[in-house]
């Protein structure tokens, strides 16, 4: 699954276009490397997202095309 879609489905970022812009601006990295929105997310990846002065680091636990709002938080584990 593409990184921008994963960020939207898991509700880490509200809209896919914003996720795409964040990737283009270099504010998203996977496994320590800056990545594009087309990066293929795999289970076990470490994704780091910078929101202004705050940084969120998560481990990908599941990759699903669709999920409910209640189950979205089960797709990742917050590390920092």
Regions found by a protein language model. Give the residues of each.
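A basic, amphipathic helix-loop patch mediating RNA/tRNA/ribosome contacts
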Residues: 1-41
């Amino acid at each position: 699954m593409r990184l921008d879609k994963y960020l939207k489905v898991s509700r880490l970022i509200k809209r896919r276009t914003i996720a795409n812009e964040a990737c283009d601006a270099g504010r998203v990295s996977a496994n320590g490397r800056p990545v594009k929105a087309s990066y293929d997310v795999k289970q076990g990846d470490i994704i780091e997202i910078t929101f202004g002065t705050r940084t969120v680091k998560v481990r990908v636990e599941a990759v699903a095309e669709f999920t409910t709002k209640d189950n979205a938080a089960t797709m990742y584990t917050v590390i920092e």
